């Protein structure tokens, strides 16, 4: 179990990889982001990216799934790793096409004691996803509450 004091700035967590299939891209987009370049291969071919692309929200949802899986693998006690008070600077930098595989990681960029919740700290991490060519496709800074029993 990891507490606030155990977390090192600069620490890196490899979260895993995910391959985006055409069917999964369309299924997610039909439910949550039904733009033509996410749901219609012909329309996408004639569009800005020249092919079907995953919704940025899809790439971000996969990131959250991998975060949850990493927490479960470490048997993280969610009561000790609280909710996220938010995120900053979400960027979708490269289109994600059907067949692309993104590999996700988190880099701890800062931490501080919570001003509003005694016994808790706020840890900030930069999450990145790189495609199979090594290009950064998305990134975001996420802030999370972590129990700080010495505070």
Which residues does each PLM region occupy?
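Short, charged low-complexity intrinsically disordered segments located at boundaries
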Residues: 55-62, 91-99
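Hot-dog-fold acyl-thioester-processing enzymes
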Residues: 1-85, 150-151
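HotDog/MaoC-like acyl-thioester-processing domains
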Residues: 1-9, 14, 92-151
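Short beta-strand or tight-loop elements
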Residues: 83-88, 104
């Amino acid at each position: 179990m990891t507490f606030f004091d155990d977390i090192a700035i600069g620490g890196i967590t490899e979260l895993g990889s995910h391959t985006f299939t055409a069917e999964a891209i369309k299924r997610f987009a039909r439910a949550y982001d039904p733009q033509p370049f996410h749901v219609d291969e012909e329309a996408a071919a004639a569009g800005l990216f020249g092919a079907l692309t995953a919704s940025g929200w899809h790439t971000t949802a996969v990131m959250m799934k991998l975060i949850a899986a990493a927490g479960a693998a470490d048997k993280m006690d969610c009561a000790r790793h609280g909710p996220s008070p938010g995120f900053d600077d979400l960027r979708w930098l490269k289109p994600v096409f059907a067949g692309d595989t993104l590999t996700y990681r988190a880099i701890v960029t800062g931490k501080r004691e919570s001003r509003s919740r005694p016994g808790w700290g706020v840890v900030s991490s930069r999450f990145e996803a790189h495609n199979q060519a090594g290009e950064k496709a998305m990134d975001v800074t996420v802030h999370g509450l972590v129990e700080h029993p010495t505070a």
